[in-house]
Regions:
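N-terminal catalytic cores of secreted or lumenal carbohydrate-active enzymes
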Residues: 1-66, 70, 74, 80-87
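Short alpha-helical segments and helix-capping/turn motifs at coil-helix boundaries
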Residues: 25-26, 82-92, 124-130, 171-174
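Substrate-binding cleft/loops of secretory-pathway carbohydrate-active enzymes
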Residues: 32-33, 77-122
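Short, flexible loop/turn elements at secondary-structure junctions
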Residues: 42-47, 76-79, 117-119, 145-150
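Catalytic-core region of carbohydrate-active enzymes that cleave or remodel glycosidic bonds
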Residues: 61-62, 68-71, 100-176
């Protein structure tokens, strides 16, 4: 599979030994002889659904065969509290309960789930304690993209209304 090979080549480029790896030799020839120390890799971006979960499993299994400590970051889509995000979380927690994830990752997690969210400032303020009660079961969370600009909350977007003090306060409350 070309996609799987692309992931493996990317990791080899970032972390391989230039004396024994052609991809690491490319990195060296680009002026960076030392490995980057890549310890986690995202698989997809805002992907979700059964097809994505199946592809994630194929990619992460191939990665873990060669790099058992590499932490794979699973996409959960961009709609919190929707069935699509729940499917990703359920799958990630099931993987974390088995021996399928990373074995000795940089964070200690077996897998990381990347949530994205674009909502109103009020939604973000209300979600300030969102992750306080998340189970700590080997499936960590990374909130990789967010914006309190209201776009997905059905609010009209204007240059003046997209990023205001209200959106800054909503995001700040969320980050606490």
């Amino acid at each position: 599979n070309n996609v799987i090979q692309d992931y493996l080549d990317l990791i080899e480029f970032a972390n391989g030994d230039p004396e024994s790896s052609s991809w690491a030799a490319v990195r060296r020839d680009m002026g960076h002889p030392e490995p980057f120390g890549l310890d986690m890799i995202g698989v997809g971006n805002e992907n979700f659904g059964a097809d994505y979960v199946a592809k994630f499993d194929m990619i992460s299994e191939a990665i873990h065969e060669r790099y058992p400590d590499m932490l794979c970051v699973m996409s959960a889509g961009l709609f919190p509290f929707q069935p699509t995000m729940k499917r990703s979380w359920d799958h990630a927690r099931a993987l974390a309960a088995t021996d399928s994830g990373a074995h000795d990752s940089a964070t200690g997690d077996a897998i990381i789930v990347d949530e994205h969210s674009y909502h109103s400032p009020e939604w973000f303020a209300y979600q300030a304690s969102r992750f306080d009660a998340y189970p700590r079961c080997g499936a960590g969370v990374y909130f990789g993209e967010y914006s309190a600009n209201g776009y997905f909350a059905g609010q009209p977007q204007t240059e003046q209304g997209a990023n205001t003090w209200k959106s800054a306060l909503g995001e700040a409350a969320f980050l606490t």
